[in-house]
Amino acid sequence: MTELHEPVAFRTALQDWLDQTDLTPPEDHSLEAHMTQFRRVQRALYDADFGRYGWPERAGGLGGPAVLRAIVGEEIVGRRLAEPGPYSMLEVLAPTMIDYAHPELAAEMVPKLLRGDEQWCQGFSEPGSGSDLASITTRATQHPTEGDRYIINGQKVWTSFAQFSQRCILLTRTGDADTPDHQAITAFFVDVDTPGITVRPLRTMHDVDEFCEVYFDDVEVDARRMLGKPGAGWRLAMDLLPYERSTCFWQRIAYLYARFDALIEEVKRQGQAVDSDLGEVYLALHTLRCRSAATQRKLAEGHRLGPETSIDKVLLANAEQLLYDTARNLLPGVIELENSEWRTEYLYSRAATIYGGTAEVQRNIIARRLLNLGKG
């Protein structure tokens, strides 16, 4: 164990390096510019080794607890050097590849993601299958004459950053009509430039096209790109979703704190009348951070994350929406009348109770799997 495996020493070394390294983002605030800046930051972190700590050596990392990755995200996003969105794919998909891909494939591919050489996306949701993943219809069938290949047909939607991605972790339906849903899902690691794949960005109400529709028309994939065994896709998804609802939010929390500080600066001249409003936001953010710290400790102790991460997701959504609701109330007209950063972020925050699993689904998980309240 090296000195930098200790979180306090690691954070100090990272802060010193960031103070001496110019990673200032460009003035261009387009999504494409944000993605380019993220790759630039990732390459710099990887080359300086900070982006390799917290990841296992067998996948190009330098070992150490996962909390080191949280520290990197907090420092980078807290300084507004990169946006939190792309980090979500890194924190969700890299652990999945490490756990489920053939070791040789993980050793080849994961460093490309850590270095910023590639962006990956997650092909789970479909037009008729969002929170109910067991009902997906995108199908993978074995090639009729080449048994070591699969042919994929179907459609995915709400696929974040697919237009910038080189690879996709894709859930498909396999088996026959008699195969139970949870045993009929198989995951593949697919190259997005494979013939038959079409990516179409979707423009959302906050005027950013980070989500996409992805179509698969007779897409051929090598069986060696299967993640796990046939029918193991449901288990993969259940292992992945807790990371989607916890670790990938580390950077989001840092970003929300930075925006909270900005809100304080904008309203501090309004006097004591706003203190209670800001206090409620601080309490929500502080509660979220404490909960996230507990999740980080579980990871550091080697525990697998499970349904308890639904609590993290509920707290994040509540804190994010409260922050931007408070900004709307304390900055009259800024969100409604001005084309400002606050407006874009307020609109995006409306989806906080939807993306990554709806608030209703999260509360059902908490009720049934943590509190054992049953389905009544």
What residues fall within each predicted segment?
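Internal helix-loop-helix
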Residues: 47-116, 161-167, 285, 299-306, ...
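A short core secondary-structure module
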Residues: 137, 148-198
